[in-house]
Amino acid sequence: MKSLKGRLLFLRKFVFFSLLILLFAHGASSSSSSFNYFDKRTNGKANNELALFSPTADSPSSVDGVLELPSAENVFAESSLYNAFIVATVDGSLHSYDRITGQELWSLFTNANPGLSYTKDENSLLSSKFLSQSNFKSYNSTHGEFYSDSTLNISYLSDDDTVWFVEPIDGGILYAFNLQTGLVRLPHSIKDLVHASPIRLLNNNVFVGSKNTTLFTIDVSNGDIVSQYPSGHRYETHHSVHNLGTKRDSVPSGADSDLSFKDPSGKKLSESLDLLDDFNYQVTVSNKSFVDIARTEYFITIYSDSNVILDLVYIDWTPTKNEIMYESFHSSSFDSKLALSSYDSSLHIVDTHSKFIKQNIPLMSPAATVFDIVTLPHNKKIDKSQTPAKFPTSVLLRQPIDTYLETMFPQIARNKTEHVYINHIGNAWFAMSERHYPLVSLAPEASFLYYNGFYIPLNSIFGLHSLMATPKPFFALPGLPGYDIPSYVESEGSTKTLPSIGKKPIPLLDPNPISSTPISITFWVIMFLSVSFTIVTFFSILRIRSSEVRPLKSQKNTVSINNKIDTSKRRRKGKRRKRVSDEHSASSNFNEIESQASFEQNQTLDILSENIVEIQDKSTDPLQKSLDSSLKSHLPEATVIQNTDGSVTVNSLTVYPEVIGYGSHGTIVYRGVYEDREVAVKRVLMEFYDLASREITLLQQSDNHPNIVRYYCKQKSDQFLYIVIELCKCNLSDLIEKPIAYDDLFKSIDLVSLLYQIAFGVSHLHSLDLVHRDLKPQNILLVVNNSPNLSKTRVRALISDFGLSKKLDFNQSSLRNTTFEAAGSYGWRSPEILSGSLSQQSKEIQVKTREGRIRQASHATDIFALGCIFYYTLTGGMHPFGSHYDCEGNILKGNYCLVHLQSLGECGVLAADLIEDMIAFEPSKRPTIEVVLNHPLFWDYAKKLDFLIDVSDRFEVEERDPPSPLLQMLENNSKSVIGENWTTCLHSSLVDNLGKYRKYDGSKILDILRVLRNKRHHYQDLPESVRRVLGDLPDGFTSYFVEKFPMLLLHCYHLVKDVLYEESQFKRYLEY
């Protein structure tokens, strides 16, 4: 063994020194090689292009046939960074913000529109295969808080409609959305189409394009336009602040310097971010600095048979061509501040050194481009007395977001599926891809898949989409055949971009190709030798490890494992706590799989993610050994058999190597079979047997319920505890955020019924005095009942993850100190958990707020999380307290917004009423789970109809002249319930039928209740035309009235609950 290890050590040293030689050889070959960017035929062209740059001291020069380019050190070493950003937003405006305080300084072009703008001649004919963005099919509908007297005009899409979007970068990248194809990115930008026009495309339609460019010179200190080429309309500057701040280290108001910046997976940014500045740049606060910026308008008009069918307008903001060279050097932030645009119209200023968000600047629309303002050394020598219009003193450089993409957002860089966010502001229809705007990956997915039928609401397509890339535009869009812009078409405005500029001189000619140099031959010889010895070393390591593992196979009741735990102990002996991970290779058994739990812990299709507390290693302490021994004695060890297919059999349980999920700190979930039933198997390290047993105990107490994940059994080997639980299809987060992946499942689900199941499961836990404390979409699992005899509900919701659950003591209404503080997950924790400090002066643990008030932490914490889950489910992934970064801050402030429920009609009104109570800041004001289950949101149409008829019967006996106090309460705020006159909201045939029998007062709630009651009792006597309007009993009939008056049911419900709750006829509606 010693000789083998000696050989291994020698081989490792040899490989190490070989690699050093390899790197040296590669560097030598790189430095001695040359790059032939221009050949003799393009010599004149290259020189002409280089002549575009101003002849300054630092401009490139040609010496002895070699283009001498300045290095980054020479260009920026003595440069000064102006203390402001210039931000171009998708609504077309320009804004300037202070780099230190984030305060807006000025704004320009506030009426411009750089996104994709649509205009259409109202008199022109529009082919059915095209869609004007301003001419969608429209229907009148009443939604949310828009009552009968104020209907909301909503636009809809059909399968034949195609909607166009543009990403405001790289010449206006075009996207097309269609219900049949999803979102498709086209390979040609608007700029390409303009340069290729005129051209016939798309069923022989004629595309004619043009562009118009205006150059502005702007005083960046106040936003004044000092010159304009060509001169024309003068634009007004809106001044917010007249002078820039001068205190460099000041902290902006409201900025959170402790907020850690995280990537879309939820993990902190990599600590290996090495893209730091090499120089200290001075931030200038001078009063005057001038920059050039170009505004280019691209116009495309589409003709069909001489008729204009669509006009597209795209406006782009760019620096001048003189600044192209400087942009190529701009590879990192000068002052370590990177401005990232978000989908929610905010600009996050991130410190690239500390990886913290320093500022969050709210904008009126998302930022399209962010420019740094840099004054170069040679510009400092300009005579200030000269005309500023002729001598801009600074240059605009786009912020180098691409440089930081892979380091700060590794998942986006590695993700094979790109995501794109689409939305519109006014007449600007824009797209933002996560590769250009990384923070849009946090946006909710578009909810158009929630809708069935030929028409869907237009606003349901706005959100995050998985990009369906296609090499040919319009290839799969209905009625739009593929096309190619001919390669021989070259516009006179097309330009050749300079090659990537490095720090070394670039010769114009390359006399010696790299492949012929002697150093290149040496390089490949050394590479061959290094690879050969690396292969030998690899197989030597395998031989040594196999010889160490072989004796374990003879031990009884063990599985042959090559685990890192023992080796880690020898290397780090004496450490009491550390993380444990297992290794897995393609050829080894599943026990060697490395545990890499993600932030959300639910990245697979079939998952069961359960949190287990932090892992502790076995200690050499005698007391710890005694404890381990006593824990293992709780359950006799089972016979473990290693099967040839890689699976493991433990008694009647077979565990397969297929990983379906990861838990916290080394817990792995595998697919398995238990007594001919497919199951999920959690493998837990034996060091945590006691903690896992507590979770098993809670599962055993609570799993006798259709909406609690089912526990089957536990098995134990000498190293692991196997917990066997129900196998599920996915979790609620997967279903809502990835509806395309679960299309069949999604279409079969009634979301309101699903929410009732979740609440029903929570009610079971609360009836057992259990507080879950970690309710979130990732812990709501979904299982499909394939047999129709099992249940009327095809999809069942199951509550899982009891790792943080706590059983309350008898008559205890709150939680223990040791388990309360860290409970819950980000974004789903109640305000009392986030802001409270625990008082230990009472047996019932109390929460003291920052204002000194005392609150109890109890079942209300689950109700709060459940309210957030309700909103998340109904709105397609939205959160009532805002975006990821602002969520918990808004929870602490009690700031919420339920506006996205308005599009759900009467269901949205009921949901908003319930959710608003569930997420109340004070726990005592939140409803119990029994009240939640009895809310009208979960009533079927028959129950709603019965309730309204009972209310009508009850109030008919009240004195009307003068009205009784109870009747006055019913009529209170009637305009917000039924409008000025409810008769104007009903169908004319129904109103005519009403007038034949008696008179009704259109301003009274009691009268509309009487109409509903009378027409229900005399439904069979109604004319056929009126019955068709009202629909069938009870669903169609009830739906007609509650959709016309969405506040009517809720108004009556609150009156009965507050005043008439003791009357017997209403108890069945209020008691669970």
Curated annotation (Swiss-Prot):
Its main location: endoplasmic reticulum. Residues 554-565 have a biased composition (Polar residues). Residues 540-1072 are cytoplasmic. GO terms for biological process: IRE1-mediated unfolded protein response; mRNA processing; positive regulation of gene expression; positive regulation of reticulophagy. Its cofactor is Mg(2+). Residues 654-938 form the Protein kinase domain. Residues 941-1072 form the KEN domain. PANTHER family: IRE1-RELATED, NON-SPECIFIC SERINE_THREONINE PROTEIN KINASE. Belongs to the protein kinase superfamily. Ser/Thr protein kinase family. This is Sensor for unfolded proteins in the ER ire1. It comes from Schizosaccharomyces pombe (strain 972 / ATCC 24843). The gene is ire1.
